[in-house]
Every structure is written in structure tokens, then in C-alpha cells.
């Protein structure tokens, strides 16, 4: 009986010895052990869907990727591994044979760490150095084909350091840019403050100036006067500039229209009265005695008012009336019915005055001494001969007086103008005949006219003058009806000169 109990105890001890695995062995006599706690915790952390934003399985489900390293070290490592050192976690992965798949991101892989195959974790062993017979060699399983991986170790740390350096450089550049922008903004603020201060100062100065000006009594009057002066200058600058007036000229001015001179002509009564007063003061006896000196002048006689300017006025010449005046009368102008006159006087008895016709060729007037003289009996009382000057009629030409040299003056044109030089004068003022007349305007009567008969007695000269005037009227009528040419004008002038000579000789 005792022998049987001893045998049973020996058998039980043998079984116990056979079941207990040796220390450090994963499998003993076909019985598997549990995987390491590090691998179990890592698998649970990666497989948890709540942590996919921080860490999750890779595209091939044979690796896991840490997407947010700072948050992984701050939140997950303390929860599962009781520390927050990401580098320590990477080193522990390296001891279990994990490798870094992608150098640009934190992706790790192991042939026994697969999604949905948690039982393969027991095949992952921790790498330790062998110590002789105490360790049992684990059976080697066939390795699954895994792409080339990079060992996590010193190389991974250096790469992380380089990445941190690049991030630091980027942050430093951004900091420098922000500092420059801050300096620029500060400078702009300072400039704006200075401008604002200057504006405030100017505003204060303006207010103080206005306050002083309002208290000043003469400020408003001076301001108004300056405005009036400015307005006057503007109005004066807008007015047309007037030509300077000649000495003794009339107040009315003439306007030049298309080369013509518009002249002011006084009424017949005023002009006649002025001339009559001058003539009555002359020494008639002394004046008619000097008629024998052959000092003659030419008077250009226009048509009467009834035969005013017409369409043929530009192609015909006016008639010529010859008369005698005193030698020393000194008349600057001799008024006729047309308002056009010229003077020709010399000291010699033979007077030859050049005549300028339309063709510009000067002609000579025959000897004017052949004109019969007036008897002395018809002369009024003696007075100074030089009194016969007409200051009231000298300024008929409002625009200007033309100074003609003593040698003669020629004016080409359809109307003939006589050049009548004098010995004692360097220049003779000539009036142009381009005058705008009105048919209603009364013209000054001619020398031989019925207007003067009521003041002067008849003389033998009136007969000759009447004949000459009748010839002139016939000449004008023929000229108006037939339109004389320039050659006919010259012929008619020569015929009149001959008629005067025949009367004198007869």
C-alpha cells in the first residue's frame, strides 16, 4: 500500500515538471505564451477608430502611421505607456524589430504587426543578446515578403533634427518679415502724426488770423477795394485797345472795314459857317493880287448827292475843277463837296503838278497861269492871309494822316489822286477817298456854287467856272452811261486843260 502512494506522487511531480515552461521561452512543449504588453498596447492604440486623426493603419494594413507627432506625445503616450517621450517610443519599436517605411513621415512596419491578425503578435520577439544554455531558440517562421524598410535608430533621429532645423529657419524668416513690417508701420504712423500736427497748427493760425482780421476796422474795406481793383483790371484787359489820337482830333473815331476808312463828316451848315467866318476875315485885295503868281491847286470834285457812289464808282475817275488860291495861304486842307483835296504850290510862275492816274503813270498838268484872274474889286477887307486854316476839318481822317514826301506821292487805284508837292513842306497830309458815304449826308458845297453867291459878288471868273462845271457834268453823265476806260479819262482831262487855255488866251 505505501509503495503505491509513493509511485503516484512521483508521477505527479513528473507531470508538473513537464508542463511548466522554462523562463524566457515563448513556447514550451507546444504550449504558446501571451504577447508582450508593449505590443498589445500599441495594437490597441492603432486599431482604435477614435485615434485615427493622430495614429492609424497604413494604406496596406501592414504598418501604422503617426500623423500628428505633438498630439501623439501629449495625449496617447501618457494614456497607454505612462510617459510622453516620442523618442523613447521609437526606440522601443526598434527593439521589437519595427522599421521605418517612409523617410518623409512616421510610418512603421513589422511582419507580425498586421491589421486583423492580433494572434501574430506572439511571433514578435524582443531582441536580446543570448546567454548560453539558459535561452531556448525559438522556431523561425518563414518571413513574409516585406518591402525594403529603413531601420529606426540613429538615422531617424538625424532626420527629425533636420526637419526641426528647417522649421526653425522658416519661423525665423517669418519673424524677420514681421519685424520689418512692424518698423514700416511705425514709420507711417509717425509720419501721419506729424502731418496731423502740422494741420492742427495751420488751422490754429488761420483761426487766429481771422480773429485779428475781424477786429481790424480797415480789413473789410481793404478786401473790398482789392476785389474792385482786380475786377477793373479784368474789364480793362477785355476791352479793345484804341489807337492813339492825333493832336486836335475829333472825339469820334473811325473803324476800318475791309481796307476802307469810315470818316466823320460834319453837317453842311457847321462846315459852311466855319469856312465863311474864315473867308470873311481875309484881306480880299491882298489875296486877289497874289492870284497872278500862278500858285494853283487842283480840286477833285465828286458827283453831287443825287449821283452818289454806285456800281461804276470803282471803274471811273472824278472830274477835275481848276481854280486859283493865294500863294501864301498855307491851307493844310481844302474842303470840297467830296471831302478829298490836295495842295500843289510853288514859287515859280510855271506850275507843273504830276497827276497819278489808274495805271500809276504820272501826268503833268499844263501851265495853270493861263487861268484868268479875279478882279480886285470883289475882294473883302484886308486880314491876315495865313488865318485861313481849318482846325475843325483837319481831323476828318480819324484813323491816321499819311505824310507824303515833298517829291510827290502816287496812289494806284481806280480813282485818280493828284500828287501836289510844296516847296516849304516836307510832307503833305493826303486824305483817302475810300469813304463810306450816306446818300442822306449833306456835302460841303463846291467853290463855284450858288451857296456862296449870297455872300460874294459875281466875278468874271464865274462864267469860265460855270463852263468848266458844265463840262464836268457832261463828262460825268457820259462816264456813267458808257463806262469810260482809263485812256478816255486821260483824253477828257487833256481836253479840259485845253479848254481852260483857250479861255485864257481869248
UniProtKB/Swiss-Prot annotation:
Positions of the UniProt region annotated as Hydrophobic repeat HR-A/B: 164-214
Gene induction: Not induced by heat stress.
Residue pairs linked by disulfide bridges in the UniProt entry: none
Stretches the record annotates as Disordered: 231-254
GO terms, molecular function: DNA-binding transcription factor activity; sequence-specific DNA binding
Keyword Cytoplasm applies: no
Origin: domain of life: Eukaryota
GO biological process, one term: regulation of transcription by RNA polymerase II
Amino acid composition bias (Basic residues), ranges on this chain: 232-243
UniProt similarity note: Belongs to the HSF family. Class A subfamily.
Name of protein: Heat stress transcription factor A-1
Amino acid at each position: 500500500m505505501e509503495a503505491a502512494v509513493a509511485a503516484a506522487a512521483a508521477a505527479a511531480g513528473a507531470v508538473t515538471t513537464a508542463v511548466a515552461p522554462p523562463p524566457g521561452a515563448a513556447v514550451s512543449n507546444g504550449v504558446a505564451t501571451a504577447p508582450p504588453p508593449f505590443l498589445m498596447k500599441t495594437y490597441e492604440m492603432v486599431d482604435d477608430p477614435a485615434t485615427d486623426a493622430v495614429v492609424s493603419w497604413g494604406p496596406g494594413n501592414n504598418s501604422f502611421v503617426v500623423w500628428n507627432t505633438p498630439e501623439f506625445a501629449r495625449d496617447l503616450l501618457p494614456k497607454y505607456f505612462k510617459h510622453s517621450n516620442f523618442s523613447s517610443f521609437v526606440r522601443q519599436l526598434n527593439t521589437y524589430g519595427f522599421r521605418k517605411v517612409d523617410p518623409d513621415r512616421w510610418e512603421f512596419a513589422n511582419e507580425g504587426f498586421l491589421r486583423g491578425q492580433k494572434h501574430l503578435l506572439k511571433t514578435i520577439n524582443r531582441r536580446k543578446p543570448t546567454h548560453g544554455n539558459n535561452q531556448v531558440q525559438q522556431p523561425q517562421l518563414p518571413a513574409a515578403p516585406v518591402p525594403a524598410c529603413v531601420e529606426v535608430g540613429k538615422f531617424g533621429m538625424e532626420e527629425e533634427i533636420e526637419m526641426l532645423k528647417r522649421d526653425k529657419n522658416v519661423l525665423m524668416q517669418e519673424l524677420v518679415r514681421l519685424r520689418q513690417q512692424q518698423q514700416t508701420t511705425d514709420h507711417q504712423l509717425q509720419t501721419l502724426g506729424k502731418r496731423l500736427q502740422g494741420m492742427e497748427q495751420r488751422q490754429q493760425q488761420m483761426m487766429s488770423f481771422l480773429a485779428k482780421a475781424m477786429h481790424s476796422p480797415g480789413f473789410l474795406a481793404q478786401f473790398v477795394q482789392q476785389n474792385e481793383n482786380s475786377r477793373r483790371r479784368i474789364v480793362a484787359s477785355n476791352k479793345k485797345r484804341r489807337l492813339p489820337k492825333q493832336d486836335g482830333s475829333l472825339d469820334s473815331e473811325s473803324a476800318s472795314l475791309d481796307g476802307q476808312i469810315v470818316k466823320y463828316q460834319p453837317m453842311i451848315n457847321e462846315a459852311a459857317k466855319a469856312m465863311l467866318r474864315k473867308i470873311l476875315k481875309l484881306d480880299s485885295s491882298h489875296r486877289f493880287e497874289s492870284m497872278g503868281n500862278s500858285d494853283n491847286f487842283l480840286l477833285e470834285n465828286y458827283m453831287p448827292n443825287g449821283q452818289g457812289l454806285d456800281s461804276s464808282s470803282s471803274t471811273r475817275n472824278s472830274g477835275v475843277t481848276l481854280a486859283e488860291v493865294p500863294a501864301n495861304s498855307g491851307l493844310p486842307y481844302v474842303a470840297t463837296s467830296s471831302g478829298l483835296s490836295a495842295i500843289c504850290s510853288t514859287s515859280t510862275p510855271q506850275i507843273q503838278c504830276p497827276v497819278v492816274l489808274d495805271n500809276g503813270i504820272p501826268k503833268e498838268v499844263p501851265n495853270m497861269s493861263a487861268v484868268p484872274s479875279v478882279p480886285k474889286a470883289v475882294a473883302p477887307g484886308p486880314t491876315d492871309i495865313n488865318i485861313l486854316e481849318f482846325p475843325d476839318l483837319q481831323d476828318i481822317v480819324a484813323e491816321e494822316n499819311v505824310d507824303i514826301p515833298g517829291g510827290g506821292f502816287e496812289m494806284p487805284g481806280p480813282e485818280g489822286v493828284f500828287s501836289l508837292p510844296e516847296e516849304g513842306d516836307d510832307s503833305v497830309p493826303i486824305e483817302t477817298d475810300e469813304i463810306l458815304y450816306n446818300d442822306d449826308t449833306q456835302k460841303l458845297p463846291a467853290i463855284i456854287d450858288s451857296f456862296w453867291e449870297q455872300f460874294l459878288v459875281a466875278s468874271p471868273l464865274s462864267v469860265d467856272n460855270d463852263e468848266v462845271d458844265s463840262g464836268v457834268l457832261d463828262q460825268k453823265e457820259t462816264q456813267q452811261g458808257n463806262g469810260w476806260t482809263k485812256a478816255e479819262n486821260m483824253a477828257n482831262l487833256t481836253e479840259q486843260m485845253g479848254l481852260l487855255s483857250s479861255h485864257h488866251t481869248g
